[in-house]
Amino acid sequence: LLTVHRKLKPTGAERVVWGDADRHYFPVAQTPWGPMASLICWESYMPLARVALYEKGIPLYLSPNTNDNEEWQATIRHIAIEGHCFFVNCDMVFTRDMYPAGLHCPEEIGRLPDIVCRGGSCVVDPYGHYVTQPVWDREAIICADLDLTQVPRSRMEFDGCGHYARPDVLKLTVDDR
């Protein structure tokens, strides 16, 4: 276990059970491949959270989630380009028969499609190209050889937190005391 991450802001019905994470749950893990960080599910829609990770120079961005649609695929490709990092999308596959027997809402479960969450796990490079294509409608372990030299090469072109930044005009402050 490299680190622990709590979701910064629970989404929708998650708020009934969980509260906001505090600033100590915004970790970046040091690995032999460079800093690695994660935002969970819709945290990746939080621009300031993404920039906080980009400013730490992450070459690897991991996102466990349940977004199984083409719009999410467009989002992760954008994030990979924006952050000039590899985006590892860990999307679950969930079928109706995976619900435990005896839940209090069998009629609602019965109306669900056979495949509730289609997956879509994949890896995207810093230029927004798929290293592995999304895997739909089945469980799979995806493997990819990543050319980490793509990260600094892509940042030579555009580095929103480096040579292309304007800290005299725009600044992000992260309270991680």
PLM feature spans:
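Active-site catalytic loop in hydrolytic enzyme cores
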Residues: 1-59, 65, 69-78, 157
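General beta-strand structural signal in soluble alpha/beta enzymes
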Residues: 3-4, 87-90
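Generic secondary-structure boundary/loop-capping signal
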Residues: 8, 13-15, 26, 39, ...
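Short secondary-structure boundary/capping segments
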Residues: 28-30, 79, 113, 133-134
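Short, Asp-centered acidic motifs that coordinate Mg2+ and/or phosphate
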Residues: 60, 86
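Generic beta-sheet signal
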Residues: 63-64, 90
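C-terminal beta-strand edge segments of enzyme domains
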Residues: 92-177
